[in-house]
Structures are given as C-alpha cells and as structure tokens.
Amino acid sequence: MNKVIDTADQAVASINDGATIMMGGFGLSGIPENLVAALHRRGTRELTIVSNNAGVDGFGIGLLLTSRQVRKMISTYVGENKEFERQFLQKEIEVELVPQGTLAERMRAGGAGIAAFYTPTGVGTLIAEGKETREFEG
C-alpha cells in the first residue's frame, strides 16, 4: 500500500464531519497551514480540534473558527483569537481547557494505547469540576 499522498486535499478527503483532529503548532510557529487550508476548502464541519492554542483571527485554526467548522476546542491556551472568544462567550463552541503538561501526556498515552492516567494537576481547581477524583496512598 502506497502511503504517500500527493496533496493536502487528498490527505483530508476521508476526514468526515465530526472528526477529531490533533494539530501541531505553538503560537504562530509550526501551524499546519496546508492541513487547515485543505479542511477549509473541503468544508468539513463539527470538528473537534486538539491543539495547544486556538490560533489567531483568520490564520491557522482561526480560519476554521471563522468559517464555523469547529464544534469543540481542546486546548491549553486560547487567548489571542477574537473569533474564538466571541463564539465561547456566545456559547457557540464547546471548550475543554487542559494544562499543557496534561495535554501532552494525554497525547502520549493515547498514542501508546493507554486508555487513562491520573495526574494531580488541576485538583481543587475549576478544571477538576465535574471530573472523577481519586486519592492514592493518602
């Protein structure tokens, strides 16, 4: 099976509405511009985007936010995108804020086939509200 794909449009052809996509980038560096542009052209909607940030207005993930293609954002920082802020305040987008280290560990664990892990990060904060807590050896 040939795993080489010639274009970004071909690469996203099988990404359907409602998909969860993890995107790289840190601030404005490392943004997967070709992936974002191809998803934008395809018009894939109801996406859950996992990234450490929500991009900026009209660029990167911000392009998908402006075209209302993102249903949920799982991120560690979302502070520079006015369209994200507007959608969040109007309750038009679901948001899961996660500490940076916890998000990285979730990615690592998922890639390794580990279904769950425990971390003390966030215990006793707003992030922990509504989530299971356990005490070990304590």
Predicted regions: what they are:
Residues M1-G138:
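Conserved alpha/beta enzyme-core scaffold
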